[in-house]
Amino acid sequence: IELGRSFVTLEYQSSRMGTKGLFALDNLWDGLGALTVIMPGARYFFGKFTMYPSYDRMARDMILYFLKMYFSDSESLILPMHPLSLWHDESIFETLFVGNDFKQDYRTLNREVRNLGYNIPPLVNAYMGLSPTMKLFGTAINDEFGDVEETGILIAVDEILEEKRVRHIDSFAQKHP
């Protein structure tokens, strides 16, 4: 199942709409969970997340380094034709992250990105929290879509965390046997 581009319009983002906007992204996940029930043969979510050229380079590099550290595709299933390189030397990040404790390194990432005045993009957070075995395929610039930086990902449906499975898949399956 392709994870297409998704965008929650500013009108429905929680900071502007209070509780009405709080569940907008959650509803997108409910829809994807429903698709796995309707299409039981679907084995993977495949797609990308986008970061804009205006996003802080240090924050972007930290996020991409972190994702590569925890979700790297060791099989080289898909490679960008023109991979995006980090602007900063990786040695900066090697000392920042422990490398063997996802939760601790995530807290560090979140703190450091916030210290730069940014947040980890919501979809990046959502994908990281969906499956510990997500595969990251690298990042490339899409020169046909405003030079955005797109990072390919793959998530195995059968490896979605139990908490997310119950919330977004099992809940739909119970209501629609």
PLM features per residue range, with description:
Residues I141-D143:
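Internal catalytic domains of large membrane-associated glycosyltransferases
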Residues I1-M134, G138:
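Acyl-donor binding region in acyl/amide transferases
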Residues I1-S6, S131, K135, F145, ...:
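Non-catalytic substrate-recognition and accessory regions of acyl/acetyltransferase enzymes
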